[in-house]
Amino acid sequence: MFKKSTSYTKFGLILMKVLDVCVNLMRLVRIYSTVYAIALALLNVTNRKKLLKFYSQFIKKDDLCFDIGANLGSRTEVFLRLGAKVVAVEPQNICMKKLKKKYGSNKKVFLIQKAISDNEGEEELMISDTHTISSMSKNWMKSLKSSDMLLVSTSAFQWQKSIKVQVTTLDRLIKEYGRPTFCKIDVEGYEYKVLKGLSKPIDAVSFEFIPTQEFVLIAIDTIKHLATIGKVMFNYSLGESTTLVLEEWVEPEKISSILLKLPQKTFIWGDIYAKFI
């Protein structure tokens, strides 16, 4: 069903060691987070035109969007440029400070410093200096550590501490802010729990997945849950391709079959798109 990916070459191992030294040096002089944020910003600017074109198929002017796992706001920025209002949800202090600095006075952005789950309350968030991989899923972290993803063997992939964060649900957000046209979810392995907190259809949802056996099965459980909410069709993309792989949207059983046939590659991620009809 799944194929195991190849191991590092000798050159690859040397490269990982060099990168590890660089990461540790940046941490030592306390510039790692800044350098990482700048690199992400440059990548997002380079990719912005493609993102605008891609998301325009889901989002129109004056639509409401949810950005769940907003991080530094790369998708929030795209949604705003498409004319949408955005509820941006992010539990990490370092990210929320940057979001407030950039969007705090923007009346079209509603910033929520919480995480999303299937119930309201309090949960544990594992924090990484590489803030895009902070997670509430210990299984996801374990899978990542044992993967062949680039840089995973370096100290860039560490979770230095854990904090308690307030959590709410998608249903609660909808009650408070309205029904979104599009909901983007990127929460590092916690997507199923997030969508379990949704009980009514919205126009479109995207959620991240990793094509490994464990997480494809979780993605399929997520697909099954969405199918209990309403009539829904699916597509998917890989990495930052901003391209839907399938020419036509397919039903839950078909997308599940497609995902099960993907080769096991933990260094690749993707997004599943669900469209209620």
Question: Which residues does each predicted region cover?
Answer:
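Phosphate/nucleotide-binding beta-alpha loop and adjacent structural elements of enzyme active sites
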Residues: 2-277
